[in-house]
Amino acid sequence: MLRRVRYLAPALALLILAGCGESGPTPEEQVRTTVAEFGRATAAKDYTALCDRILAPELIEEVESIGLPCERALRQGLGEVEDPRLTIGTIEIDDDKASAEVRTSAAGEEPSRDTLELVNLDGVWKISSLGS
C-alpha cells in the first residue's frame, strides 16, 4: 500500500502545481476592474487617477478640447456632482475593444443607463468613451 502511495505522490504534486498556474484575470475581469476604478475615482474626485490611469488618450483629448487640462476640465464638469454611484452590468469584448453597460446615479439627479466604451492599449484597458 505505501509503495503505491509513493508512486502516486509525484503525480499528485504535478496535478496540484498544474492547477496553480493561473494566467491572471480574464479580459472581462480586467474591463470590470477598470470600470470599477472609474467609479471609485469619480466618487473620490480623484481626477489625477482618471486622467493618468483610467481614461484613454482619445477621451483625454476630447475632454481637453474645452481648453483646459484634463484634471481641471473634469473638476469643472464633475466637481458639483454629489455621491456618484456606478453599477456595472453586461460587459462585451471584441478583440481590443470592449463595452460595459453601467447604471449611474448621483444625489439630486435621475439615474441613467449608459454604455462605456473601452480600448486595450498595450495590455491595459482604458475608457475611450463615457456614454452612448
Where do the model's predicted regions map?
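Short, well-ordered alpha-helical segments enriched in acidic and aromatic residues
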Residues: T34, A44-E61
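Short, low-complexity, Pro/Ser/Thr/Gly-rich segments in the mature regions of secreted, periplasmic
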Residues: V119-S132
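Bacterial N-terminal signal peptides that target proteins for export
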Residues: M1-A9
